[in-house]
Regions:
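Phosphate/oxyanion-binding active-site loops and adjacent basic polyanion-contact surfaces
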Residues: 8-16, 108-119, 249, 463-466, ...
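Coupling/switch/interface segments within P-loop NTPase motor domains and analogous charged loops
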Residues: 293, 315-465, 603-613, 618-621
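The start of beta-strands in P-loop NTPase/AAA+ ATPase cores
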Residues: 53, 81-83, 237, 486-487, ...
Length: 798
């Protein structure tokens, strides 16, 4: 058996020699005389997780007569053909105990089986782009801690013991066996070539461009006062980092993230944008201190979905919730009918939607307006009279009920998000009320959700689930769900709703939370800024470390354009560029109608200029697309229920295909519906995403395709209507408020680039485009127009 090593550092020399000797002894006693083993040290963090794999072992035994390794288990024989073993090392003195599934720490609990399962999934996902993808693999933790004297080995971890490769090999075979064989990858003639391909692909994916290097330098910079201040403040008061778009809020939050990890603690980073999760992982996985066992980055929806699921709340929704929603719906319809009949009596005609709201907008609560608008539009599409109004009312109610019956059970979390959060908070804040409200004592199925099992009585019946047990289970589940996190960092926290805020404060304590807030100017999800200085109307201690107020992302010439845009539309106050960027940067506005979207020549030229600066493809260009015109998709109906119990029908894309191709590009397609299925972008990929996903991202060059179409799409959206209704005052105009909503989105898009902002206008003659061109001219932007075509002399009419 040939055993090779790759990339072994001095730090791991003794460990690798120990493993090689152990493997040689094992296979010398077997019938496997031919085969190859590769022990790779420091396999790069090329997957979706954090941190390198300290040891990755590939084993291949050719299928030859008399050449085999036999794994015996319960009198059954399994023949080892190919095996991949990953070993992650964890030195953490905060670990105080461990059992068959969980590591226990002063900062929470960790389900290590789940984490190792994630590592295996990440490596298999990565291998799909290699020349021989993995069917299976087995990851292990080798854990050393002074916080616990216990020592043991099981199928997944070696806890405070020596690194016994014979046990690891046995458990790896046990976990990957299938039928009579152990086959983690397909037949290979040259295992070395396969392993080197894996390493080369991993190196290509993790290659660091100049922007990522600079970003890492900024994140890990020593002596920055704010992260030190936040660390000193942990456990005393919530920290709130406030500032405008581009002033460095997310950068400072990642500096805090790094400071917490570097201090030896565990930390969680939450954001609304799935693509920002990818962006942060792309950068932070290059910092050695960040590992899957101490750093976690997720979307808020991911966190709350898993939290509410583990707490058992999702299992409790039933007909009761349906009746509650329908009760609210009927009440709102009856309010509408009273006003409709009153309007008919006064004017002798039935009101349309515009007439109705012009007459009664001051008399109807804004929370009722969404459902009432749907009802009136439904009536408009039907010829109705006093006789048929009651019949149409019943038909509308039945239609809404059928919608809920079909969707509520399958998509309770997404469809009824706010009510799920409300009940999750009730469970945390008042477990006794929750216990009685849902009659938990008789809900035996709830025990399985809460990870509990109880023995039956002698007569075969189950005992009641006592409140004391329930209360204890809540505490244990919260500790498991914290995933070993001392601190939680929340980006763009002005957009959180009240229950998101309250749950996070309950789980982590406000004093262990750090948030960024951009104020009203940067609201996207909601129309009201969340106040993190109060909980249930009670003030909580808060600290406000100052930010510089300067824009470290954009160069001066882009800042000029952005400030002119903001000043013209009065949507935000000006920002200042960093001193070193004075006179640099450019804005290009392309008005050429002959080019749809953008030309490949334009993109390639911009890319080449970025490459000269040392940018990787990931850093170089970020292409922003409107949701129409550049993708094909199939749709199905779904529902969403907001915090006011309004039930809305939405179209969900089940599949999206990017209808842009460029042979010179490796495209990372970020327009898919389920972004959780994507991998972290590689360094050699160019990102194509929707405008709606760009918050918090940056690139050397940003290409805004059909920016005018995006503006008009957002202005006519349901979100814009809600924003207008919520913010409407006596002298405000609804259309102006819709435009304000859309302009905030445009502002977010044009603050993403560092060096070049390229804007392609789909229709240069519309009002928005004309104004953008005017702003561009006044601020020194480059305007690309159609070339003038002059007639020949003999074609002149004189």
């Amino acid at each position: 058996m040939n055993i090779y090593e790759i990339n072994v550092s001095n730090e791991y020399r003794k460990i690798v020699d120990h493993i090689k000797k152990g493997l040689q002894d094992i296979f010398s006693r077997s019938h496997a005389s031919e085969g190859d083993i590769y022990v790779v040290n420091h396999f790069p963090a090329a997957t979706d997780g954090f941190g390198e794999t300290e040891l990755l072992i590939f084993i291949n035994i050719p299928d030859k007569r008399g050449n085999y390794y036999l794994h015996l288990e319960k009198n059954k024989r399994y023949y080892l053909n190919s095996l991949v073993i990953g070993i992650k090392m964890l030195y953490d003195n905060s670990v105080t105990d461990a059992d068959d599934t969980t590591l226990y720490s002063t900062e929470g609990y960790l389900d290590y089986k789940e984490e190792l399962g994630n590592e295996e999934f990440y490596l298999q996902k990565f291998s799909s782009c290699c020349n021989n993808s993995l069917r299976n693999c087995a990851y292990f933790y080798w854990i050393v801690t002074s916080g616990c004297k216990k020592s043991f080995t099981n199928d997944y971890i070696l806890f405070n013991t020596s690194l016994d490769i014979s046990k690891i090999l046995y458990y790896a075979c046990h976990r990957t066996r299938f039928k009579q064989g152990i086959n983690c990858f397909g037949k290979v003639d040259d295992l070395g070539a396969m392993v080197r391909y894996y390493i080369d692909e991993a190196n290509n994916r993790t290659e660091i461009g100049i922007l990522t290097k600079n970003r890492i330098d900024k994140i890990t910079e020593k002596g920055v006062k704010t992260p030190l201040r936040v660390l000193a403040n942990q456990g005393k008061a919530i920290t709130i980092l406030r500032g405008k778009a581009g002033c460095g809020k997310t950068l400072m939050l990642t500096r805090v993230f790094n400071a917490v990890i570097a201090s030896g603690h565990h930390c969680r980073f939450l954001t609304f944008n799935h693509l920002l999760v990818f962006d942060l992982k792309h950068c932070l996985c290059r910092i050695p201190a960040f590992r899957n066992t101490n750093a976690y980055i997720h979307t808020l929806h991911y966190f709350f979905y898993h939290f509410s699921k583990k707490m058992g709340v999702l299992s409790l929704f039933s007909e009761k919730r349906l009746n509650e929603l329908m009760g609210v719906c009927v009440q709102r319809i009856d309010i509408a009918n009273e006003y409709i009949q009153s309007f008919k009596e006064e004017t002798d005609q039935w009101p349309n939607n515009e007439q109705f709201w012009e007459r009664y907008k001051d008399e109807i609560d804004s929370g009722d307006s969404t459902e009432i608008t749907k009802y009136i539009k439904y009536l408009e599409n039907n010829i109705y009279s006093l006789d048929s109004l009651a019949e149409l009312r019943e038909a509308y109610i039945q239609k809404r009920k059928e919608l809920l019956l079909n969707e509520l059970g399958n998509e309770v979390f997404i469809a009824d998000y706010n009510n799920v959060l409300e009940n999750t908070y009730l469970m945390l804040d008042n477990p006794r009320e929750f216990y009685e409200k849902y009659n938990i004592k008789d809900r035996r199925g709830f025990l399985n959700v809460m990870s509990r099992t109880d023995k039956k009585r002698d007569d075969g019946t189950m005992p009641e689930y006592q409140y004391e047990e329930f209360d204890e289970d809540i505490k244990n589940t919260v500790m498991h769900t914290k995933w070993w996190s001392k601190s939680v960092l929340i980006d763009e926290a002005q957009d959180c709703n009240n229950y998101e805020k309250l749950i996070l404060m309950k789980v982590y304590g406000a004093e262990n939370i750090v948030v960024t807030s951009g104020g009203k100017d940067q609201l996207i999800r909601t129309s009201l800024v969340t106040d993190w200085t109060h909980a249930l109307e009670k003030p909580i201690p808060a600290d406000f470390p100052p930010l510089t107020g300067r824009c470290y992302r954009q160069k001066e010439n882009i800042v000029k354009f952005v400030n002119s845009f903001g000043e013209h539309y009065s949507i935000t106050s000006p920002i200042k560029s960093a001193n070193e960027s004075y006179g640099l940067g450019r804005v290009i506005i392309d008005t050429r109608n002959s080019i749809r979207g953008f030309s490949g020549e334009t993109l390639n030229q911009i890319r080449e200029e970025g490459k000269v600066q040392g940018c990787s493809d990931y850093e170089n260009c970020l292409v922003l697309l409107p949701t129409t015109g550049y993708s094909s998709k199939t749709k199905e109906k779904g529902i969403v229920i907001d915090e006011l119990d309004n039930v809305d029908i939405v179209e969900k894309s089940t599949n999206r295909k990017l209808e842009i191709s460029n042979q010179d590009l490796k495209i990372w397609n970020g327009i898919v519906e389920r972004k959780s299925g994507l991998s972290v972008p590689a360094s050699n990929q160019t990102r194509f995403i929707y405008y709606e996903s760009c918050r918090g991202l940056e690139a050397w060059n940003v290409l805004c395709v059909d920016l005018d179409s995006f503006f008009y799409n957002m202005r006519s959206s349901k979100e814009a209507e809600l924003y207008a209704r919520t913010n409407q005052e006596i002298f405000s105009n609804e259309e102006d408020l819709k435009s304000e909503f859309a302009l905030h989105w445009v502002y977010m898009a044009i603050t993403r680039p560092i060096d070049t902002l390229y804007i392609k206008l789909g229709n240069p003659s519309n009002e928005f485009s004309q104004k953008l061109i005017e702003i561009g001219k006044d601020s020194g932007a480059i305007i690309l127009n159609e070339p003038q075509v002059y007639p020949m002399v003999d074609e002149l009419p004189f």
